[in-house]
Amino acid sequence: MTQLSVVILAAGKGTRMYSDLPKVLHPIAGKPMVKHVIDTAKQLSAKQIHLIYGHGGDLLQQRLSAEPVNWVLQAEQLGTGHAMQQAAPFFADDENILMLYGDAPLITATTLEKLIAAKPENGIALLTVVLDNPTGYGRIIRENGSVVAIVEQKDANPEQLKIQEINTGVMVASGASFKKWLSQLDNNNAQGEYYITDVIAMANRDGYKVEAVQATNLMEVEGANNRLQLAALERYYQKIQAEKLLLAGVTIIDPARFDLRGTVTHGKDVVIDVNVILEGSIQLGNNVKIGAGSVLKNVVLGDNVEIKPYSVLEDSVIGESADVGPFARLRPGTELAAKAHVGNFVEIKKSTIGEGSKVGHLTYIGDSEIGANVNIGAGTITCNYDGANKFKTIIGDNVFVGSDTQLVAPVTVASGATIGAGSTITKDVAADELVITRVPQRHIQGWQRPTKK
């Protein structure tokens, strides 16, 4: 089987984005456009991925430092052919070279596999699409059904401008063929650029067969040159993700108001309300309910978990039949055991909450271990930070913590203890003790409220 290498063109500035960020780093579903293309290339088992970079190269390399790509500098942006010329020294004669674009993130491996399979042994295959309005695109010129050339919009004559089949820019040929044709490119055109599309005419001249494969989905080959186009790609991507989940049995109340910015696995009878955002790696058990406006990132939810509206969870694990929210925030390192309850306006960070325990409202729990069947009263704060270091609070099983309590870490409250409301706990509490630290109540008779003078 012939090996495959992929070239991704990613040197453009993206002037119409009006941004300091290189165009290909603008995100679709929370991931840079070019990263989508790299991931697709990986699905094709490419031997090597050559990434052509230019504008914003330092930032591009920084953001993609973990990617297994060969960085190829295009110091001057003199056209697509010029970009390919920079990568040509790395091409092996006997491998196939697939050319992709870093700002066209929705191309699928399935479509590219069809294109690669259609490539003649001695020839080139290119991906085309038919548009109702082809303005701005290179036109496919055919003679007797065969592709003989591609003419760019600015170089096309009036008759050629009527053609609706356009070039997507995606093509595949052997390394030897590309090297031969790239060495013969010139910039004798209206733009003064080196067009990769000129290799089609060269292939015909040399007697090579040119095979065209029509993409069936326009959005798959669409690029994003401005933020309006970027938003259109985002909406299409999210539509596809929602449809996949719906067909797999997930209820999404309004697919147009759902965003998936990562991957999700799920059980049966999951219900997702409107304006929910799922990021990173999400695992949902059976009968999970996620309320409106909630944001989940890298979260595991067990069976029968309910996330009530407008809750934010990150890097957290929620046990079966637990519930969270509304308006709760679970920060990284939070683990809730089965049947735990976290109510409104509660923030938890790097803490475990035991089975059946309740943190009802208006509470901060940080760097803590809380046992089973504990009740944390409203307004409780674990004071875990002294301005320099973090300290731990440990609460045993069956503890009752009254409202408006401050637990000054490091501190341990043993099982069965009761903390009276309004207490500030600075020392360890033994099992089954009652601790009250508030000032005794005083009654002042005959007191007069002050009046305005």
Curated annotation (Swiss-Prot):
GO term, biological process aspect, one: peptidoglycan biosynthetic process
Assigned EC number: 2.7.7.23, 2.3.1.157
Binding residue positions for acetyl-CoA: A378, N384, Y385, S403, A421, R438
Pfam families: Hexapep, NTP_transf_3
Keywords: Acyltransferase, Cell shape, Cell wall biogenesis/degradation, Cytoplasm, Magnesium, Metal-binding, Multifunctional enzyme, Nucleotidyltransferase, Peptidoglycan synthesis, Repeat, Transferase
Catalytic reactions of this protein: alpha-D-glucosamine 1-phosphate + acetyl-CoA = N-acetyl-alpha-D-glucosamine 1-phosphate + CoA + H(+); N-acetyl-alpha-D-glucosamine 1-phosphate + UTP + H(+) = UDP-N-acetyl-alpha-D-glucosamine + diphosphate
Cofactors, names only: Mg(2+)
Cofactor binding description: Binds 1 Mg(2+) ion per subunit.
Region annotated Pyrophosphorylase, chain positions: 1-227
Region: N-acetyltransferase, residue numbers: 249-453
Molecular function in Gene Ontology: glucosamine-1-phosphate N-acetyltransferase activity; magnesium ion binding; UDP-N-acetylglucosamine diphosphorylase activity
HAMAP family noted in UniProt: GlmU
UniProt-recorded name of the protein: Bifunctional protein GlmU
Species whose genome carries this gene: Glaesserella parasuis serovar 5 (strain SH0165)
